[in-house]
Curated annotation (Swiss-Prot):
EC number: 3.1.1.1
GO molecular function: carboxylesterase activity
Tissue specificity remark: Expressed in roots, leaves, flowers and siliques.
Region entry Disordered, spans: 1-20
Enzyme class: hydrolase
Protein name: Probable carboxylesterase 6
GO biological process: cellular response to hypoxia
UniProtKB keywords: Hydrolase, Serine esterase
Role this protein plays: Carboxylesterase acting on esters with varying acyl chain length.
Residues at the catalytic site: 176, 276, 303
SUPFAM superfamilies: alpha/beta-Hydrolases
Length: 336
């Protein structure tokens, strides 16, 4: 799609309360839902076209997945050299975070992070711009993820970038709500039919899970108003994204246990942030599954540090995480 920007941006209007009635749910500064169902999103983070500096060694373009649902993806493809072009590269299918309700594959923070991930890990990356709740409550995002994989299955022989891709080595990845989506998509593809590709593993960065009973890390971090994710915002994201009438005991709020022991998805990397209210739920999903799950705890950093953190610690830890993901994909010890 070249430089075409496919994302839709909704801006705020101070008169909306008069037109659409009172606000019935919101996450301050990010999203408001009005009584008549109108949804207003604030664009706090800039959206960018699919362009990258030449020196990064990665090309970028947007592709349409489904015209009817307006689902699209941003592709990052490492530039080949004479030395590297002999072997094909793994593919990471990535789902952005945002509580299922906000976010875009064109957000600058994701664009920069995934370009670095592609360059560092020597992988193609496909960042999926899925449908958002509350207009499209779950499982819409899960369905879009599955459709993105089915699109890959059809596109593998029709695109120049596909010639560089090893479709036998696909990793489903995402952060926060995107980590939840990645695992749900993997579960839905646990018994694939007519797929000429293989999901080798999942990479879950601070995956978004919850429950009605509060965890210790939720009580410890959840009321920190400086945190990216608070208890108030976490609860609001779930209210706006779950099927009508569901609470936080719904299966969508829990890790998919069947996929952890799946014979088709053989490996999982879980990246946990110490200062994240999700820490306990992320650690718990790994307990007893050490044979198939590699758990990495990033100390001193909070939720979404890898895309929103501005401190030197966040920057250094992001570099470490990129190295850990690279090591997980390519089977080596990052400390050696």
């Amino acid at each position: 799609m070249g430089g075409t920007k496919l994302t839709h941006v909704t801006t705020t209007n101070p008169n909306n309360s008069n037109i659409h009635g009172p606000v019935v749910d919101e996450v301050e500064g990010l999203i408001k839902v009005y009584k008549d169902g109108h949804v207003e999103r604030s664009q706090l983070l800039p959206c960018v076209d699919p362009s990258l500096p030449l020196e990064l060694g990665v090309t970028c373009s947007d592709v349409v997945i489904d015209k009817l649902t307006n689902v699209w993806a941003r592709l990052y493809v490492p530039m080949t050299t004479t030395k590297s072009s002999v072997s094909k590269l793994p593919l990471i299918v990535y789902f952005h975070g945002g509580g299922f309700c906000v976010g875009s594959a064109s957000w600058l923070c994701y664009h920069e992070f995934l370009a670095r991930l592609s360059a560092r890990s020597r992988c193609l990356v496909m960042s999926v711009n899925y449908r958002l709740a509350p207009e499209n409550p779950l499982p819409a995002a899960y369905e879009d993820g599955v459709n993105a994989i089915l699109w890959l299955n059809k596109a593998r022989n029709d695109n120049l970038w596909a010639k560089q891709c090893d479709f036998g080595r696909i990793f489903l990845a995402g952060d926060s709500a995107g980590g939840n989506i990645a695992q749900q998509v993997a579960a839905r593809l646990a018994s694939p039919e007519d797929l000429a590709l293989k999901i080798e593993g999942t990479i879950l960065i601070q995956p978004f899970y919850s429950g009605e009973e509060r965890t210790e890390s939720e009580r410890r971090v959840g009321n920190d108003k400086t945190a990216v994710l608070t208890l108030a915002s976490s609860d609001a994201w779930w209210r706006m994204s779950l099927p009508r009438g569901a609470n936080r005991e719904h299966p969508y709020c829990k890790p998919v246990k069947m996929i952890i022991k799946s014979s088709t998805v053989t490996r999982t990397l879980v990246c946990v942030a110490e200062m994240d209210l999700l820490m306990d739920s992320n650690m718990e999903m790994c307990d007893g599954n050490e044979d198939v799950i590699k758990r990495v705890l990033h100390k001193g950093v909070g939720h979404a540090f890898h895309i929103l953190g501005k401190s030197q610690l966040a920057h250094t830890t992001t570099l470490e995480m990129l190295c850990q993901i690279d090591a997980f994909i390519h089977h080596y010890d990052p400390l050696n």
